[in-house]
Amino acid sequence: MAYSVKELFKTLQGEGAQAGRAAVFCRFAGCNLWTGRESDRAGAACTFCDTDFVGTDGQGGGKFADAAGLADAIAACWGEHPADRYVVFTGGEPLLQLDEALLQAVHAQGFTVAIETNGTLPPPPGIDWICVSPKGRAPVVVERGHELKLVFPQADARPEAFAHLAFEHFFLQPMDGPARAAHTTQAVQYCLDHPQWRLSLQTHKYIGIP
């Protein structure tokens, strides 16, 4: 299978339970909930999306003919340090492209594999860390994993709709944009009132890293 990658870069994970951890981010092109075109944003399941996932023209992006080639590019992006290799497959929606062949190839390079998914598609076996981020009314089929991270507030995706799912960690992440301060205040109060939930901030945006 060929893979279309918007961008490939090394940075620190900025969000959730793995915040602060060095990681290679492999951002796949494409999403099943929005085309990525501004003209279509109003009809998207997540009108608040702040990610460019269209095309393959980003840093380190491109079309990769097979799993081995993409795994080699991920390893090269990580660099010479052999320990604690960690790759995050994201998007767009990574489960449109992530398959068992690619998982096997990056595992063979010594990586722990994480995904950040909207949870609407079933994952292949072998993923080490599953983070689901529900979007609007889009039905979630991934009902167990390591981390559920909900952008908050969403009128069509309330925290109580997901609190019963089998995840180890539950995070509220204040929605970015002009009302971020108000959203943060709301998220803080919700976490205080519902201690099952923890606050996740996009620390990479605060410290100016990708």
Curated annotation (Swiss-Prot):
Family matches, as InterPro entries: 7-CO-7-deazaguanine_synth-like, Aldolase_TIM, QueE_Cx14CxxC, rSAM
HAMAP family assigned to the protein according to its UniProt record, in alphabetical order: QueE
Keyword list, A-Z: 4Fe-4S, Iron, Iron-sulfur, Lyase, Magnesium, Metal-binding, Queuosine biosynthesis, S-adenosyl-L-methionine
The enzyme's E.C. designation: 4.3.99.3
PANTHER family found in the cross-reference section: 7-CARBOXY-7-DEAZAGUANINE SYNTHASE (PTHR42836:SF1)
GO biological process, one term: queuosine biosynthetic process
Annotated cofactor note: Binds 1 [4Fe-4S] cluster. The cluster is coordinated with 3 cysteines and an exchangeable S-adenosyl-L-methionine. Binds 1 S-adenosyl-L-methionine per subunit.
Catalytic activity, as annotated: 6-carboxy-5,6,7,8-tetrahydropterin + H(+) = 7-carboxy-7-deazaguanine + NH4(+)
Cofactor requirement: [4Fe-4S] cluster; S-adenosyl-L-methionine; Mg(2+)
Quaternary data: Homodimer.
Protein name (Swiss-Prot/TrEMBL): 7-carboxy-7-deazaguanine synthase
Highest taxon of source: Bacteria
